């Protein structure tokens, strides 16, 4: 493992860590020797995840000023932030025939504008010190349009594009950018799904995959492998073929 990418001894801030992938990732990072701060809205849930081993900093990701204050608090508690992981996310299936503008906006507010708030809160200081890692959990749903995921998929595709552009822009400042694209992971978000979820994995398995990828210095971490292959291949299909496939799925 390249020492540049080691997790042990790093100051890592996870945003969206009260349950699911974020909580499992926080636990895995502590086990690998990282110093971890965790954030989400509910302090009681964060305290349960932290179990006295992590710094708890509650924050509403939609509140820009609160995000800036949280970043200051994390630095005061841990020191310079070596890595931030934006894992906050919202998912609810849409009925496109009864278009819900508020539901779409909620996806944008948390999944995309929250990421904007996160990057704005930590990037200037990373540029100043000349190092840092920005990590965001997107989704394989951002690779192609999926019926019912008009809002969720759009925000995840935007995340993927944003991070790809940002990676090139900040590399000269000693900052690396990693995009994490999970398939189906057993969490509170997926528990309400009524459709088939192939290749489902547990949150702790996802956390190990993320940590392994980070320690290898990967720019993109996609898992599980069967879902990664399926969705990567799906990107190559002609629009007409994909549209026909989605019509069958949405029947």
Protein language model annotation of sequence segments:
Residues 18-19:
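Conserved glycine-rich cofactor-binding loop
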Residues 32-49:
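Conserved glycine-rich Rossmann-like NAD(P)H-binding loop of the short-chain dehydrogenase/reductase
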Residues 51-65:
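Rossmann-fold cofactor-recognition segment
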Residues 95-108:
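Substrate-binding pocket helix/loop in short-chain dehydrogenase/reductase
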Residues 119, 155:
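Active-site helix of classical SDR
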Residues 139:
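Residue(s) in the substrate-gating loop at a strand-loop-helix junction
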Residues 179, 195-230:
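C-terminal helical subdomain
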């Amino acid at each position: 493992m390249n020492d540049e990418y080691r997790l042990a001894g790093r100051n890592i801030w996870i945003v969206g860590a009260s349950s699911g992938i974020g909580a499992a990732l926080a636990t895995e990072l502590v086990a690998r020797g990282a110093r971890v701060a965790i954030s989400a809205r509910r302090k009681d849930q964060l305290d349960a995840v932290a179990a006295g081993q992590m710094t708890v900093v509650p924050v509403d990701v939609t509140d820009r000023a609160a995000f800036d204050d949280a970043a200051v608090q994390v630095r005061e508690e841990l020191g310079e932030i070596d890595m931030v992981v934006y894992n906050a996310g919202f998912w609810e299936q849409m009925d496109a025939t009864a278009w819900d503008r508020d539901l779409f906006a909620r996806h944008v507010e948390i999944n995309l504008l929250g990421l904007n708030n996160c990057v704005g809160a930590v990037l200037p200081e990373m540029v100043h010190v000349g190092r840092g890692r920005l990590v965001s959990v997107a989704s394989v749903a951002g690779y192609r349009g999926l019926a019912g995921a008009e809002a969720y998929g759009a925000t995840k595709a935007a995340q993927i594009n944003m991070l790809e552009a940002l990676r090139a822009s900040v590399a000269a400042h000693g900052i690396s950018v990693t995009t994490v694209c999970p398939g189906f992971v057993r969490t509170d978000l997926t528990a309400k799904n009524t459709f088939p979820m192939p290749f489902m994995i547990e949150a702790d398995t996802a956390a190990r995959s993320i940590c392994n990828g980070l320690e290898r210095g990967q720019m993109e971490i996609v898992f599980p492998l069967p879902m990664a292959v399926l969705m990567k291949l799906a990107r190559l299909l002609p629009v007409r073929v994909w549209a026909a496939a989605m019509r069958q799925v949405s029947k």
